[in-house]
Amino acid sequence: TGEPVGFDVDLIAAVAKKMGLESSYLPNQKFDTLVPLIKQGGKADVAIAGITITDDRVKEVDFTEPYLDSNQAIVVKKDSGETEDSLNVADKKVACQSGTTGDDWISENLPAAERVPLDDVTAALTGVSTGLYSAMVIDLPVASYMLTQSFSDLEVAKEIPTGEQYGIAVSKDQPALTEALNKALADMESDGTMKDIKTKWFGSEI
């Protein structure tokens, strides 16, 4: 149908309902354009797309309270035997989504490997599946969903605890909106809506 689907889509729809609003979506945007888009204003009020709250991003935009913990995951072909150590060599290609914390993690922790930043998560995971890439470093919630839905031949070789969390990005010019979003998120936690959405998409309350 062309309509966006996913955990974040269900989440923002539920948030909008709590606020008495309707959500409308911009056409697909590259991940690394989202924070600049919100900062400049005019096109979108909020961005929700698995955006990790980081010091650099907080300088540009405001964030709601976190709505999901997000560690990183190293995803490999099942039974490949690949590990963090085995990937840190010159002939290994490790994919990531451009501009993400996974992108940064590869640079810092797998400096010998060839980092391959891509715009599309599905293309990156398909590359791991076909052997084009040895691994992908990706947010664990995204990996959990994608491996369950589409990539049963892949597995998480390692979970990387990062202490990272997702938040909804909001322009610094709209503090009242951030406050209203926080209230809606808190209501969803207390009435079970958040738990239901997490269980629907991840199979459990991750």
Regions found by a protein language model. Give the residues of each.
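Short loop->beta-strand "edge-of-pocket" segments that line small-molecule binding or catalytic clefts
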Residues: 5, 86-100, 114
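Alpha-to-beta junction loops
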Residues: 20-22, 40-49, 92-93, 111, ...
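Periplasmic-binding protein-like
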Residues: 68-76, 140, 144-186, 204-206
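Short helix-initiation/N-cap motifs at beta->coil->alpha
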Residues: 9, 24-37, 81-82, 98, ...
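Flexible hinge/capping segments at coil-to-helix
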Residues: 64-67, 76-94
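Extracytoplasmic small-molecule ligand-binding "clamshell" domains
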Residues: 1-50
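Extended ligand-binding regions for polar small-molecule ligands
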Residues: 9-18, 80, 93, 98-101, ...
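Beta->alpha turn/N-cap motifs
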Residues: 27-31, 42-54, 77-78, 99-100, ...
